[in-house]
Amino acid sequence: MAVAALLATSSGLASAIPADAGRPADGAATLSARATLADGARVDSRSEIDRLEKYWTPERMAKAVPADVPGPRAALPAAPPRGAGPTGRPGTTPAAPPLKAGERAAPRVNESSAVGKVYFRNPVNGGDYMCSAAAINSPSKQMVTTAGHCVNTGGVNGVAGHWMQNWVYIPRYRSGARPFGTYAAKEYRSFNGWINSGDLTRDVAMVTTWPLNGARVVDATGGHGLSWNFSRTQHMTVLGYPGNKDNGELQWACQGTTQQDGAGPKIAMHCDFGGGSSGGPWLRELNDANGLGSQNGVMSTISSGGWNQSPYFDDPVKAMFDAQGSIT
């Protein structure tokens, strides 16, 4: 086990701003967009999926760099700090094993088939980037979770960010190997707060993927459950592909106990994962026998001293799950 875990930079562990401090009332609402190629074509048919697969050659993947981490945003008006307690009644959704257990390799501690690497093109600068993501069990069996900044560049002062292009998810990527193939994105969803204002407390996204050769991603790899409104102090396992560990070529893990990120709503853990692990899941109750847990956070930021942060999973995260989880 690698005891470590990104990502977006923040000034310090105690620097977080309450989620609703001076932000638009709809910051916890969500927006969706169809996935596109670099030329703007929607990924709506086999021909576009084929073009997407041809784009991500081994050479291009090797040259991709960890996703740009969100920089500091303009100061927001002060607001009373939010307490550390849950914001509502805790809830969970179940994890799901793959349909055919024989398709999984023998599990290794802290390596999960339901966690993988993401590659995409940033339309602003034309660069190729990488993040992490995780399959999550939903009615569609086609959804993965990641960070908001892995699907959208994030807005500034109400000017909306740009949706990423050529987006693919590779379950249990390992040194170029794609044991479950490459899943093309079909539709993204993230919070208004991230898309329009770059609100790091809403740096969460969910992505519907296309089936691959008739297999939905959760059926192929299994999918984690979802937890929300739990205490900010939890034993968690963080999984992802940090660029400062084996150049992001292997799945790494960090295990420890989370804490509240200063006076703000986010949670934090000392993991020291570098860029590339953005979007990796923070899991409660990871079962090493099947590599599945209950997702209660997503890798978002890093601050001084190796502290990593995740948005707090609350009722709006569950609402995002409900809104996107049945899309096929």
Place the predicted regions along the sequence by residue.
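Acidic glycine-/aspartate-rich tracts in secreted/extracellular proteins
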Residues: 149-152, 173-176, 211-214, 243-244, ...
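C-terminal cap/linker of serine protease catalytic domains
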Residues: 296, 300-328
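Conserved catalytic-core segment of clan PA serine endopeptidases
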Residues: 98-129, 136-137, 158-215
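Secretory targeting and sorting signals
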Residues: 1-22
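Chymotrypsin/trypsin-fold serine protease catalytic domain
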Residues: 185, 200-270
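Terminal peptide-recognition signature
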Residues: 57, 118, 133, 146, ...
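Protease-domain processing segments flanking chymotrypsin-fold serine proteases, especially trypsin-like
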Residues: 15-137
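Catalytic nucleophile loop of clan PA
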Residues: 272-298
